[in-house]
Amino acid sequence: MIDNTKIRSLLEEGLTAFQLDSIGDLLLDFLLLLNKWNKTYNLTAIRDIETMVSKHLFDSLAILPWIKGNHIIDVGTGPGLPGIPLAIAKPDLQFVLLDSNGKKISFLNEVKRQLNIKNIEPIQIRVENYHPNQGFDTVISRAFSSLEQMIKWTEHLVAQDGLWLAMKGRFPDTELVPIHQTYRVERYAVPGIEGERCCVLINNTNKE
């Protein structure tokens, strides 16, 4: 039995820290829908809905300060993380949510329909087969095992002056060694999560 009052309280506490108090209801609706679908379709390994608040919602929202531009793609979005929380927080930005898993894209289409989120476009395709008409201002992912792999598989998606934004746990010392583009690493804290979190911002400086 889910204690909605407790979940709402956890949400409100964290959203106050992010100065995003107004989006609590929509995030709660998303969380409840994710929890419901997860029981059947195994969309995320996290089963405890209270843990989802911090590890899914708050961890996603923590990278908001570093998003660049209006045209964003979340590669390997899974059940819409970080894309859905970001899209809810920034309804003026456009988000493409890319994943090759049909169950996850079906879930995202249901989220879009039920929650009436107009600024997302879920697309089922492998990243190497996706060739949009224009590059994205920010390419986000927490799905790749290394920064080098992220750049390799998504370099055709980023705009000439765009940005890669990779979500990491510990400071990725060894992953940064082969990176030739200019980058910076921002450490951040997430309400309810102990341990190191950081965001790697890599500028697309290799294109002519």
UniProtKB/Swiss-Prot annotation:
It catalyses: guanosine(527) in 16S rRNA + S-adenosyl-L-methionine = N(7)-methylguanosine(527) in 16S rRNA + S-adenosyl-L-homocysteine. It is found in: Cytoplasm. Its EC number is 2.1.1.170. The keyword Magnesium does not apply. GO terms for molecular function: rRNA (guanine-N7-)-methyltransferase activity. Keywords: Cytoplasm, Methyltransferase, rRNA processing, S-adenosyl-L-methionine, Transferase. It comes from the Bacteria. GO terms for cellular component: cytosol. InterPro entries: rRNA_ssu_MeTfrase_G, SAM-dependent_MTases_sf. HAMAP family: 16SrRNA_methyltr_G. Belongs to the methyltransferase superfamily. RNA methyltransferase RsmG family. This is Ribosomal RNA small subunit methyltransferase G. It comes from Legionella pneumophila (strain Paris).
